[in-house]
Amino acid sequence: MFFSFIVLIIFLTVVLGFASFSKLIFYKEHIKTHNKDFIFGFFSLFLLSNLLNFFIPLELVSFFVIIFGILFFLFTIIKKKYDINFVSLILFSLFFIFISHEQGITYDSQLYHLQTIQLNNNYKIIFGIGNLQPHYGMNSNWHTLMSLIFIEFLGVNLIFLGNIALFTFFFNEASNHLSIKNKSLPSIFLILSIVYILSYSLFHPYQNGTILNNLGSPETDTVSMIFFIFSVYLFFLFINNKNEKNLNLLLLCVYLTVSTKISYIGIVILPIILILRGNFFNLKINCLISFALFLWFVRGFISTGCLIFPISSSCISSSDQ
């Protein structure tokens, strides 16, 4: 359990390192990184893993990606550009490692998630892999990211800590709102979401409940759920305080949600509502999301012949399919 905790801390620093680096590139200045900016970190890792897998097996770059994330995290620490409660972040890390330590891997992860991750790790994108097994054609960016971090430290593979890291950031963000006296809608929504997850897990008859039982598995169900909830939170946050940075985070989080699990496509209604209300995303974020979507669609087409598998209307006839 101790080694799992140490490796989780390593992955958290990698995500925060990429979050700081992404913000530096995007905003052209080294502004402070907050807990909610983990969205930037995951987005940049999604984008990087997708882009690299077009050309090389991801196992060739896993170590270098981890090292870069850690180094940029340390650089940002030295520059004092983090505005994050690291004490609560560490405490939540310990909590989730403790409750998930002996749960084992879920059935779906054993059946096909691990195989999908290993294929992306060992090979470039494989033409028509969805024809071999439909599950391999499910184009989840989360699994592509897991393929990028398919590497062991201290006998612990990072892929088993991915969703634990996400839950840690999520709960840490909620803890920031507990001390606020006059709680706004975003605070209330986030706190109630945490209360529901914990209550459901506490009263569920089977171990930690079907939500927290997924911790430690490279699955997409709880991951997409957290991204979905966080998208709604960012939506309320922007409504409450029309800050452009929150608007950018919302669009990135919506992309993370949909590209992790396509069944959450309904979340795109949130940015549409904002556009109808007269709010517009800037050109830079539009180009970034468009490029990320382009890579995701092309990857899906190469793997299955469909832009969005298994939606048949998105399939394109070709001589190779």
Task: Describe the function of each predicted region.
Residues 1-80:
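Membrane-embedded, hydrophobic transmembrane alpha-helices
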Residues 48-53, 246-262, 267-273, 291-294, ...:
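Membrane-interface alpha helices of multi-pass inner-membrane proteins
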Residues 55, 102, 152, 218-219, ...:
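Transmembrane helix irregularities
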Residues 70-82, 267-290:
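Perimembrane helix-loop-helix junctions
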Residues 97-192, 213-217:
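Active-site lumenal/periplasmic loops and adjacent helix-entry segments of GT-C-fold
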Residues 101-104, 145, 284-321:
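Membrane-lumen/periplasm interface segments of specific transmembrane helices
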Residues 184-226, 234:
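Aromatic- and kink-enriched transmembrane "portal" helix at the membrane-lumen/periplasm boundary
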Residues 223, 228-247:
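Membrane-interface transmembrane helices that cradle and orient dolichyl/undecaprenyl
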